[in-house]
Design a protein with these regions (language model features):
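Extended, highly charged
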Residues: 1-284, 288-299
Length: 299
């Protein structure tokens, strides 16, 4: 049976010596520095940070997740010793056939362990790291999925875009021009309407893999992620926007991007080791709901 969520996968990593647990690292550059060093080692397990100063024990950060073939194999419920060539063949077959499984709407899930609205929203309670010395802030969404709905067709799209924490109830969203998220947001704003958006952090790694693929406009990524793991993704609808999010995710928040509402964003050091540019102004998300599991894991 495939892993149901991120925690199942983390358990598999631990069983297969693919996980290192680090206690006491500070979110101010220490976590980022450890991850940078770890990525350059010959053996580089995923790293789970706990006991982060200033935050409750159990509020964790997971990094270096998909930088090895064995961990990708485990995420896909494949034998851990499948070779790189076999993994490439697996992906080629998947992309050629693109099997799908419809998502399964459920009434609840562990994501609803803690739900906050209005003045109770505070995404800064999550120990979001400053990954690099010259970063412009704390980026809660680097390995995340951003969910939107086309206002004309009703198509649900999700993609991997950059999200920066801008305070307790505000985030910013950076989408490159021409990406599906950018197209959808512009459709709302051309009508003079706010764009609803949901951000999910800490989900099954297969969902993140699909978020980074170049799917055709109109293709439902939830269907594709279900096809990748062999069963439908369990989803719940966010209370304000109605956007679907994985019921077993660690963290999610929703809100609206209003026309001409922008905020300073970035920069963020990229995984390649460079900064792509300086700070820019990007669309602001004004949050209306924030939820997370007990003892959440930031991915």
């Amino acid at each position: 049976m495939p892993n149901k969520d991120l925690r199942d996968w983390v358990t598999d990593l631990k069983k297969n010596n693919q996980l290192q647990i680090v206690s006491g690292a500070d979110r101010e550059e220490e976590i980022g520095a450890i991850v940078d060093i770890q990525m350059r080692q010959m053996t580089n397990p995923a790293v789970l940070f706990d006991d982060i100063p200033g935050y409750p024990k159990g509020y964790r950060v997971l990094a270096n997740i998909l930088t090895s073939v064995p961990r990708i194999n485990l995420a896909l419920d494949e034998p851990i010793d499948k070779s790189e060539v076999e993994l490439v063949d697996y992906w080629r077959t998947y992309m050629k056939n693109q099997p799908t499984h419809d998502p399964i709407e459920v009434n609840g899930g562990p994501l609803l362990d803690n739900v906050y609205e209005g003045k109770d929203i505070d995404i800064t309670k999550i120990p979001t790291p400053r990954w690099h010395e010259h970063d412009g802030g704390y980026f809660i969404g680097t390995a995340c999925m951003v969910v939107m709905k086309d206002p004309d067709s009703g198509w649900i799209n999700y993609g991997a875009y950059r999200v920066q924490s801008q305070g307790p109830s505000t985030a910013s969203l950076m989408t490159s021009k021409g990406k599906h998220g950018d197209i959808i947001r512009n459709k709302y704003h051309e009508k003079g309407e706010p764009c609803p958006v949901a951000v999910v952090v800490g989900m099954h790694p297969a969902l993140f893999m699909v978020a980074g693929l170049e799917m055709p406009y109109g293709k439902n990524e939830y269907d594709c992620a279900g096809g990748l793991i062999g069963e439908g993704i369990e989803i719940i609808n966010m209370p304000k926007t109605g956007l679907p999010v994985p019921a077993n995710a660690e963290i999610a928040f929703e809100g609206f991007i209003h026309p001409d509402d922008r905020i300073d964003e970035g920069p963020l050091g990229e995984w390649t080791g460079y900064y792509a540019g300086g700070a820019t102004t990007q669309p602001a998300i004004r949050l209306e709901t924030f939820m997370h599991r007990d003892n959440p894991i930031l991915l």
